Amino acid sequence: MKKEASELLGFSPQKDIVYNELLPYKDKLDDESNEILAQIKGNLGRAVQLREVWPGVLFWTRKLSTYIRLYGRKFNKEDHVLFVKLLYELVTIPKLEISMMQSFARLLITLLKKKELLSREDLELPWRPLYELQDRILYSKTEHLGLNWFPSSVEAVLKVLIKSCRPYFPESATQEMLDEWKPLMCPFDVTMQKAMGYFELFLPTTLPPELHDKGFKLWFDDLISLWVSVQNLPSWEVNLVSLFARLANDNIGYIDWDPYIPKIFTRILRSLNLPVGSSQMLVSRYLTNAYDISYVVIWISALLGGPSKQAQTQLSGLFNGITSFFHPSNHGRWLMKLMKLLQRLPASVVKRLHRERYRTPTWLTPIPESHLLSEQDITDFVESIKQPVLLAMFSKTGSLDAAQALQNLALLRPELVIPPVLEKTYPAMETLIEPHQLTATLSCMIGVARSLVAGGQRFPEGPKHMLPLLMRALPGVDPNDFSKCMITFQFLATFVTLVPLVDCSSAIHSRNGLTQVEKELCSASAEFEHFVLQFVDRCFALIDTSTLEQTREEMEMEKMTHLESLVELGLSSTFSTILTQCSMEIFQVALDKVFNFATTSIFETHVAGRMVADMCRATTKCHPAEALKLFLPHCCSAILQIAANEEVLNEEELDKELMWNLQLLSEVVRVDGDQLLLYRSQLVQILQLTLHLKCKQGYSLACKLLYHILRSMSLIYPREYCSIPGGIQQHTDTYLPIQDWGRPGELWNLEIQWHVPSTEETEFVFYLLDLLLKPELQRLQKHTEGQQDISRDDVLQSLSIVHNCFLGASSLLPPLHGEPVPQLINGMVQLYETKVYTGVDYDMSRENYREDICKVIRPLLNHTLEHSEDDIKSLFSIIKIINDLLHFKGSHKNEFDTRWKSFNLIKKSMENRLHGSKQHIRALLIDRVMLQHELRNLTMEGCSYRSVHQDLINDLLRLSTSRYSQVRCRAQNVLFTALGTYNFCCRDIIPVVLKYLDPERTDVTQQQFKGALYCLLGNHSGICLANLQYWDCIALTWPALVRSGMSPSMSLEKTSIVRLFDDLADKIHRQYETISVNFSIPESCVEIAVKMLKSSSPEPNPGAASEQEELEGRKREEQKNKDAMQKYEKLVADLLDCLHDRNIPWKFEQLTIGFLSLMLRDDLPLPSSAVLFFVESLNHDSLLVRNVAISAVAGILKQLKRPHKKVAVSPYDISELKTSLQSPVVSLLTGDRPDNQWLQYDSSRLPRSQRDWDECCFIEKTHWGYSTWPRKLMLYAPLEEQPKQGQTREEMNEREQIIYDHFSDQLFIDQFIQYLSLEDRKGKDKFSPRRFCLFKGLFRNFDDAFLPLLKPHMERLVADSHESPQRCVAEIISGLIRGSKHWSYSKVEKLWALLCPLLRKALSNITIETYIDWGTCIATACESRDPRKLHWLFEMLMESPVTGEGGSFVDACRLYVLQGGLAQQEWRVPELLHRLLQYLEPKLTQVYKNVRERIGSVLTYIFMIDVDLPYTQPTTSPRIREFTERVLARLKPLTEGEEEIQNHIVEENMEGDQDERTQAIKLLKTVLKWLMTSAGRSFSSSVPEQLRLLPLLFKIAPVENDDSYDEMKTDAKTCLSLMSQGLLYSDQIPQVLSALEEISRSSSWHARYTILTYLQIMVFYNLFTFLSDAKAVCDVRALVLRLLEDEQLEVREMAATTLSGFLQCNFLSIDEPMQAHFESLSKTRLPKRKRRELGSVVDTIPSADLVRRHAGVLGLSACILSSPYDVPTWMPQILMDLSAHLNDTQPIEMTVKKTLSDFRRTHHDNWQEHKQKFTDDQLLVLTDLLVSPCYYA
């Protein structure tokens, strides 16, 4: 096949679309594709060579993507590589406009999508340009200031782009990336997220094994150990998981994951966030940062297989542990994740298996033999996931996920999966009362249909179920239950498509050598006829119940409801599928039945009639000759008979019989055209008779008939969709139909029967047009010219006939011709439309009716608009006709889209992902070929814009601005479609639209004005004329929009118009992307383009450009960049002009200011006139304008920032670093090392003089130096090399002078500050980053020039304790501190002399409204700053934050502010942290709750730096361990005493020292707050330290769920809940268990009780880590069993609950010894009760014997409760044992009763199944127990 292709083409294509080979006109395609490809290569190459990015390059890259859509990758490898390289160069042009970048990127992704086509030898792409692109866009420094506008989609596109280029990065890339990003890995900083994000995206994982040393081996150990040691799910952990999943999947068999597998599964289980235990608090961050299931699934499926089988064991454990969560009665927000896991995992395993066994080998590394999945592996996998999937079938989220999972599992192991589904399906079909069961099981059956019908050696008995299923599904065709009906239709259609319905029962006698199964199938196939007839009867019943008269009044609704139309669709498609698959004999019987039904009664034409007509159409479509013989003569004679009567033709209400026959006729003619030719005379007669009926319904049916006849004759389409090529045959000696059950279509043996219009048919079509269309056109023409006046109804009738004639025959009519519209755009590259051949050779000798209709319709439109503008129906019709004249060639785009979607849905529901290679059923393959034909038919890209189109579009525009809104609306939609089709027509149309908005014109009506605005707004999917991304377009539309505010037809009273302007402004702001002013193409692109122009096969056409042209191209490129600058400046000037017009309404002033703010860019400064305007607007009356101005001025200041010189230094040359590194060895460690100590804050070495300041090497960014040092560190050059500070006014440029003058003006400043200290929205205001940026910019660009003026204001504001003045001064101060980054020492010193008193004052005035603002202020001021530069600030904040002056509240606020500053500094201020801790420790016994909480939070931040990460040095910041020691010492009084700890302190500070115990309790409360806040924040939990506090917490935590407890107890409870969820390392487990063991011996039963709840959560959240440690499991088991015999009843019961939980998640198993242990306990003899004398004291203490007996009973009951949804083999016996204790003393009796009632509750649903597991005797006892009187007692 390939060979022939390459000989015809002249090259061997990379991968073309095979479906093209099956089209009826395939011979013409090779020449066509070669011609187009040559054009693309030639013109794309030239466009780049002539440096014409727009329109040339953009236009021809679009052509290339269309080419790929039509032909696939039909070019040779050499071209492929050149295309990729060229596009890579284009995407990475630094100044390229983002919208173009995206368009190139999408094409590049398509080119790289099939990575098997290009290997690493063929192609290598550098990684750095992509990194720079990503960095420039994602971490843009100017976007937040409004200097860059990026579209929201850009992030996703870049991600996919990098993913596609990743396999081709050079082998040195990994090391380079690590050097680049490793220094960013500082876990306390946002850069950690950045580094991990880049690692996840960029690190290549597909290197061949011999290069692994240069690939993942460089980073795997570091990153996996980091992942293993992080305990609290920071947001970057998700990136690691995705990276590991990809690594595992790309290198199966090359990495030993075994040591990590328990950890991996533990973390996966944790990230499902399942609820465990009774009272659970989830740490919120576990929810937000949970793993993405799609990565988890890839990771798991890559771990399966291999020699150790460990992953499968853990996976089974995982599913065993969570199976019960899938039960339909459970529901919660976690359910979606579980379902996703179920749905994706089988798909992922199937994908892997396909890669191992069926995929054609490619250059990618194959999986080594040792790690391939064996048959046993697959069976184990299916077994482990089967149970949850079967439970999930009936889930609350619907059965779709389960159905998809089953579809994939059935491919792997049909014999394991299908039988249980069948067991659920048969009963569901029998019951009538549970329809949801039926819908669920049927949708699952549809998924496994192919596996079932095909049978195969694994599941040979599969096909036997086919007939029983079909027969039992029939009752589902139920008129009363819509969803049941639809799923039944889908079910029947799916199964019947797979099977030819032929009766082969006689083959049993005539053929020998049939197997047993084949014999059974043959005899069963006798039922098929019965099935088809029954189905037809059911359909008739359905139709009878849904006639219009029965359901609603005739007048209300003529149309079908939405539901009915769905049923109609389901009915007709299922029926036609069944008939297609029938043998001729069965068909004949069905045909007679349908014919009788249709002709013996008369149906109304709206609901029932449509359904019946659909069924009749299905019969004629299947076998046209046989069916037409019955239907056509019948209908024709009936119609002629009735219509012979003259009056009938003029009746308003037609005879029902006539209507019905007409409807039936119009549907049955939808068959192959050649069959209709036999009846041509009758059909013509009927058409002539009925087309001019008076009744509208009548003539519309006649039009439909005409349309269907023409379409059948003129289109190309497949004649049949049967599942076997050549139609369904009877069995013969050599052929047995049952062997074709479930057979996929063979792509190269489809034998599609095409209908291609023959000459006769074409003749007949044109005969009909001459006969019927011509007279109507003449009639309309006369009407227009005023010769003959016709009524409106007649015009409408004529238009209807014209439209239907055109729709039917349009594929034979050539497109409209005309002169191209000149001078829209001048480029040097040709842009021409691609003509795609679609099987029709136009006959130019005939009349071109497309042109004729066009010539008649335009004058008619004119006439209608002038004389009868209210004839809306005719206008609607004309709009439709214009739309079709422009675009229609046989199919509509929206119909094509829905068909494409439904094709994909069906393909998904029936595909075989395991074998791949297009093994779809034949009908689907034919459908796909047909879609390919339609796709070619609809390809309209880049059409030339001709004068005809111009005229029609102008007509549409006229309609879009006409009087009636409905007409406008429809015309606008057609207009938008047209605008998207023709090249550059928008440029032609914009001026015309804008004329309506011209304020000079007085003749524009309000409707026209609105219409024009709507035309500019566009619809949601199409083009928005107001915002085309070109300077020439915006320069016209934006000023025009603003000026339209003065138009006489504009009124702000009309809400609809105001809303339109709002929508326009909103859309422009949403969609605007920065438009480039630089359109240059770099040399590197041109080189590749020249190579492409030299390539051969096919030769590029046209060839390379001459030198002359190249020079011209360069000149144009320069000119274009100049033009862009001028247009930009002109647009800004125009907008400013509009603003200076005094009459402009306020609304439009705001609109203009919005537009102006979009004009800020980072590569061109704003013209100074606009700068002046924005600075003046800072004091505008309107708040909205002031806010825009603040943002804009902040942006302008960024534009004016003079660049500070940076020098690249090797870090090891810095003097401070040299001195600290005596030894030359550079360690790999991160964290606090000798070589980064000089970066840290050290009060003895602070720069306190000019000389120190100059010598000190400041490093501003906090992350440098924590991890490894970068190769090159960028530092600021010394002060003398920086731009001059303190410029005089003369040295400034014009823009700077404007700002300088205003801010030096006392009045301006006073007014400005007054506005800033007003309240905007009461109680909603926050610290504003925009204002901060403004002040930062002022102080950065102008040093301290404005301080003298601002100083009095700041002093005044600080003294005012109201919220707004305080916020205003906070914004100024943070801007000041950050803006002073580069000031000289003397200025900085003066600044702090001013600021320190101000801040002290502010902090003493702090209030509940302002403390957050001050916190933000200080945090913002300290962000990314060297702490040594801010030492004044830190020293001031450290002055006794907790003084008690001003009350507890001020203390808490000061701490908050201080914490904000220190947290930003992370690891660089250990000294300050130590000082703070020392200062706080004595104060931990605070009385006030708010201060305690704040101290807790501060402690979290103090200890944040003490992390336990791999390769990290112990920190020099405070450490938790030492702190815990000191705290425990102070808590002694509490830990030693045995009595209950009560919180009996009244909250008031009494003088004099209280006793130690009270102090200890106060201390404990603060410690609790610290434990709570640190649970979710730090990276690693300090388990050993927390363990020492555990005994104390267990003592306090309350047992009952009671809210009335005091703060201390609830806090303790919360702490325990959070600690128990913590992730444990395997070495910490023994420590925890021994601590728990110790506490379990304590005398307080509260502690013993709480241990159990703690244990439940801890074990579940670390399930696999525990399971991998056998000793730990034994210890837990022993602990629980011991507490089961506790003397306290509550503890015993809790132990039983815990035990049943452990059994349920398979942590422990029910084995013989355990069962025996419980039985022997439960048989403990109780001492006889003595008869007590009356009045004697009842002994209440339970004897030890009773406790043991109860423990045994509890143990048995735990076993029973541990399997709530099924009955394991051991259960009946245990139930019998339990029942023996029903009459024991309390508390035993209660336990037994409760257990039995629970058992009854949980097993009630499926009792029929469960009953099977018991013997008859046991059942008797059980029934007796569950319903016996004692049950009610």
Curated annotation (Swiss-Prot):
<feature type="region of interest" description="Bromodomain-like (BRDL)">
    <location>
        <begin position="1640"/>
        <end position="1728"/>
    </location>
</feature>
<dbReference type="InterPro" id="IPR035309">
    <property type="entry name" value="PSME4"/>
</dbReference>
<feature type="repeat" description="HEAT 1">
    <location>
        <begin position="460"/>
        <end position="504"/>
    </location>
</feature>
<dbReference type="GO" id="GO:1990111">
    <property type="term" value="C:spermatoproteasome complex"/>
</dbReference>
<dbReference type="GO" id="GO:0005829">
    <property type="term" value="C:cytosol"/>
</dbReference>
<feature type="compositionally biased region" description="Basic and acidic residues">
    <location>
        <begin position="1111"/>
        <end position="1122"/>
    </location>
</feature>
<dbReference type="GO" id="GO:0070628">
    <property type="term" value="F:proteasome binding"/>
</dbReference>
<dbReference type="InterPro" id="IPR055455">
    <property type="entry name" value="HEAT_PSME4"/>
</dbReference>
<feature type="repeat" description="HEAT 6">
    <location>
        <begin position="1670"/>
        <end position="1708"/>
    </location>
</feature>
<dbReference type="InterPro" id="IPR016024">
    <property type="entry name" value="ARM-type_fold"/>
</dbReference>
<dbReference type="GO" id="GO:0035092">
    <property type="term" value="P:sperm DNA condensation"/>
</dbReference>
<feature type="repeat" description="HEAT 3">
    <location>
        <begin position="1164"/>
        <end position="1202"/>
    </location>
</feature>
<dbReference type="GO" id="GO:0006281">
    <property type="term" value="P:DNA repair"/>
</dbReference>
<feature type="region of interest" description="Disordered">
    <location>
        <begin position="1095"/>
        <end position="1122"/>
    </location>
</feature>
<keyword id="KW-0677">Repeat</keyword>
<comment type="function">
    <text>Associated component of the proteasome that specifically recognizes acetylated histones and promotes ATP- and ubiquitin-independent degradation of core histones during DNA damage response. Recognizes and binds acetylated histones via its bromodomain-like (BRDL) region and activates the proteasome by opening the gated channel for substrate entry. Binds to the core proteasome via its C-terminus, which occupies the same binding sites as the proteasomal ATPases, opening the closed structure of the proteasome via an active gating mechanism.</text>
</comment>
<dbReference type="Pfam" id="PF23096">
    <property type="entry name" value="HEAT_PSME4"/>
</dbReference>
<dbReference type="GO" id="GO:0070577">
    <property type="term" value="F:lysine-acetylated histone binding"/>
</dbReference>
<comment type="subunit">
    <text>Homodimer. Interacts with the 20S and 26S proteasomes.</text>
</comment>
<feature type="repeat" description="HEAT 5">
    <location>
        <begin position="1626"/>
        <end position="1664"/>
    </location>
</feature>
<dbReference type="Pfam" id="PF16507">
    <property type="entry name" value="HEAT_PSME4_mid"/>
</dbReference>
<feature type="repeat" description="HEAT 4">
    <location>
        <begin position="1344"/>
        <end position="1382"/>
    </location>
</feature>
<keyword id="KW-0963">Cytoplasm</keyword>
<keyword id="KW-0227">DNA damage</keyword>
<dbReference type="InterPro" id="IPR011989">
    <property type="entry name" value="ARM-like"/>
</dbReference>
<dbReference type="InterPro" id="IPR021843">
    <property type="entry name" value="PSME4_C"/>
</dbReference>
<dbReference type="GO" id="GO:0016504">
    <property type="term" value="F:peptidase activator activity"/>
</dbReference>
<dbReference type="InterPro" id="IPR032430">
    <property type="entry name" value="Blm10_mid"/>
</dbReference>
<keyword id="KW-0647">Proteasome</keyword>
<keyword id="KW-0539">Nucleus</keyword>
<keyword id="KW-0234">DNA repair</keyword>
<dbReference type="GO" id="GO:0005634">
    <property type="term" value="C:nucleus"/>
</dbReference>
<comment type="similarity">
    <text>Belongs to the BLM10 family.</text>
</comment>
<dbReference type="Pfam" id="PF11919">
    <property type="entry name" value="PSME4_C"/>
</dbReference>
<protein>
    <recommendedName>
        <fullName>Proteasome activator complex subunit 4A</fullName>
    </recommendedName>
</protein>
<feature type="repeat" description="HEAT 2">
    <location>
        <begin position="983"/>
        <end position="1022"/>
    </location>
</feature>
<dbReference type="GO" id="GO:0010499">
    <property type="term" value="P:proteasomal ubiquitin-independent protein catabolic process"/>
</dbReference>
<dbReference type="GO" id="GO:0006974">
    <property type="term" value="P:DNA damage response"/>
</dbReference>
<dbReference type="GO" id="GO:0016607">
    <property type="term" value="C:nuclear speck"/>
</dbReference>
